[in-house]
């Protein structure tokens, strides 16, 4: 059987928004300056990388980044890349009320419409953290796919709503929490699985307030780990989705750009590989796996 391996770069432009919403740098001019590097220096470097190898990419952009870096946003759109939603200030969905989460989502959609001329079809939850109603909000507002959940790794699937589970409460009797997870109802929302082991940020970005922050792991080690994953996928699977999550904060650094060049060149040696946007992955999955009505 011929191989069909869809490969994609998802670029999360956390930039200043990441420090405001997730990384604990909201009071640090130095950390904010690192966010400015991501937007002003990092984005053009990644665009140059993609242009060199003729690759499409999907950029998941917080609203804050859209409004803070208008020149760089125009460069992304002019290059023909896809733009998806990624919060406004990289807010944690779990920490917000339902109204706050919906307001942020609607603002993100509005800004992307103004930027690209069309509504986004895809969403990435900041910090890959879903609230109990994120699924429902995405469905309500017409999103086609999400890239935040991890039920699978290299195969898309339809998102469920209504999963429930019992948390442990040691003030109760054990029988009160000893219950299995209950699966909810499948929806039309396509999940393109997220994968912490194909994300550049945790191992290669130093964050002062994060207790498990690294930032100094060699890109040679990370690049080999990503290549090893691709090699296994290519050996074991005829159809698969291999999506890599990167950030201009990290992957625009010289040592990491060289890592990506090696990864791209390795992947390109294989037959049956196709570089695509996330929207193309979702459309391909929908054709392969139409839902039964």
Curated annotation (Swiss-Prot):
Pfam families: Polysacc_deac_1 (PF01522)
PROSITE patterns hit by this protein: NODB
Domain annotation NodB homology: ranges: 29-276
One GO BP annotation of this record: cell wall organization
GO MF annotation list: acetylxylan esterase activity; hydrolase activity, acting on carbon-nitrogen (but not peptide) bonds; metal ion binding
InterPro entries per record: Glyco_hydro/deAcase_b/a-brl, NODB_dom, PgdA-like
CDD domains in alphabetical order: CE4_HpPgdA_like
E.C. number(s) listed in UniProt: 3.5.1.-, 3.1.1.72
Keywords: Carbohydrate metabolism, Cell wall biogenesis/degradation, Hydrolase, Metal-binding, Polysaccharide degradation, Xylan degradation, Zinc
Entry binding sites for Zn(2+): 14, 86, 90
Catalytically driven reaction(s): Deacetylation of xylans and xylo-oligosaccharides
Residue stretches in coiled coil: none
Subunit field text: Homotetramer.
Family assignment from sequence similarity: Belongs to the polysaccharide deacetylase family.
Function (record text): Catalyzes the N-deacetylation of peptidoglycan (PG), an important mechanism that appears to confer lysozyme resistance and to mitigate host immune detection; this likely contributes to pathogen persistence in the host. The exact nature of the residue in PG that is deacetylated has not been determined. Is also able to catalyze the deacetylation of acetylated xylan, and, to a lesser extent, that of chitin and chitosan. Therefore, this enzyme might play a role during infection, considering that xylan-containing carbohydrate structures are among those commonly consumed by humans.
Protein name: Peptidoglycan deacetylase
Organism: Helicobacter pylori (strain G27)
